[in-house]
Amino acid sequence: GSIAFKGDTLSKITPNIIAQMGISRTFQNLALFKRMSAIDNILVGRKLHSKANFMDVALQLPKARKEEKVNLKKCEEIVEFLEIEKIKDTPVGKLPYGLQKRVELGRALATEASLLLLDEPMAGMNVEEKREMCRFILEVNEEYGTTMVLIEHDMGVVMDISDRVVVLDYGKIIGDGPPEEVRANQNVIDAYLGVSHGE
C-alpha cells in the first residue's frame, strides 16, 4: 500500500522532506539522546525551523542568537505544557520511562507539525503514566489543533481518546469508524478475542 498526506504520496519522500511537510512522530522504542538534557532533546525538534547556518552559529552572529532565543522560548512553553519543568535540565537517560516518553512527545511538538504520528505512545507504561499521557494527547489536540494518528494496542486507551478508530488484522482493515461503532463490530471482537482465521 501507500500513504498519502495532503495529496502527496510519502513512500518515496525522504524523512527530512516529510518533516518539512508538517509531519512529526514519536517512536515505539525511545529515540532520545540519553546524555542530553530534556530541554536539549526538545530543542532538537526546532532544527527544522533553523535558518542560521553553521558559521552564523559558530560566530554567534545576531541572526543565530535571535533564532536561539525564539527556539528556547518555544521549548520552554512546551516544557511547561508537559509539566516537566523540574526535570528539564536532567539528562534523559536518568529519567523514568514515562517522563522520557513525555520528552519525546515534546520534541515532536517542537516541530510544530500539523500531523503527529504516535507509535505506541503507551507501550511499557504503568496505569498512572498512561493516564497522564492520554491527558497530554487530548490537550495537544485541543491546545494546538494538531491531528494525531495513534498506533496503540491498548484498546481501552484507543476507545477512550479517539474520534475515529481503524482496526487492522494482518494488514486488512476490519473496522473503521467512531469508537462506539468499532467496539460493537463483530470482526473486531473476533480478532481481539482470538477467533481463529480458519473459522
Task: Pin down the residues of each PLM region.
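Glycine-rich phosphate-binding loops of nucleotide-dependent enzymes
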Residues: 1-199
